[in-house]
């Protein structure tokens, strides 16, 4: 914890110096109830319950805030909240898209992403499984489910489509998503 404090002090001092340079003063410390509300919304997307607020207000230990952080990180709602942005980036949808927008159950992939966040899966493993889980030696069911990242694109099920044209569209969509997710840039202009 001493290292955490030194790290925090380093950042606090940097921020304070910049505020002084701009002739600004830091915001006052929020009250405990506000801190818990902010923390809960940030980590789970949900406001704290009255019981959680009462427990936090009664906890006068020096690490009361840290205990709340740990509690919220253990909540299944943490994975749900953290998965939202990734699922958006991965184009997650329980439908095929286009005009004939039929149901496509992608819930196993969604549940896998939520579980990966809740288990604190290392980022390299999280990415590796999604891109090539099926190509790893002795892939598990979880690894295979993770590769649904590569199948989240729209699929046209309309009659009379030109199959080859849409195969190309699917590849372009996956390539664009890869660029957005892993390169931090759009590659759509290369189409």
Question: Predicted segment positions?
Answer:
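Short, structured secondary-structure elements
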Residues: 1-191
């Amino acid at each position: 914890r001493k290292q955490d404090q030194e790290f925090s002090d380093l950042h606090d001092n940097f921020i304070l110096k910049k505020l002084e340079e701009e002739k600004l003063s830091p915001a006052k410390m929020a009250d405990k109830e506000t801190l818990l509300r902010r923390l809960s919304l940030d980590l789970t997307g949900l406001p704290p319950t009255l019981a959680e607020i009462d427990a936090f207000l009664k906890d006068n230990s020096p690490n009361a805030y840290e205990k709340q952080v740990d509690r919220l990180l253990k909540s299944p709602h943490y994975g749900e909240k953290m998965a939202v942005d990734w699922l958006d980036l991965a184009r997650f949808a329980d439908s095929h898209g286009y005009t004939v927008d039929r149901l496509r159950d992608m819930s196993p992939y969604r549940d896998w992403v939520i579980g990966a966040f809740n288990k604190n899966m290392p980022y390299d493993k999280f990415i590796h499984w999604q891109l090539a889980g099926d190509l790893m030696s002795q892939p598990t069911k979880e690894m295979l489910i993770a590769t649904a990242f590569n199948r989240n694109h729209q699929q046209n099920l309309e009659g009379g489509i030109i199959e080859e044209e849409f195969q190309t569209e699917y590849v372009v969509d996956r390539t664009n998503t890869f660029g957005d997710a892993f390169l931090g840039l759009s590659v759509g202009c290369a189409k």
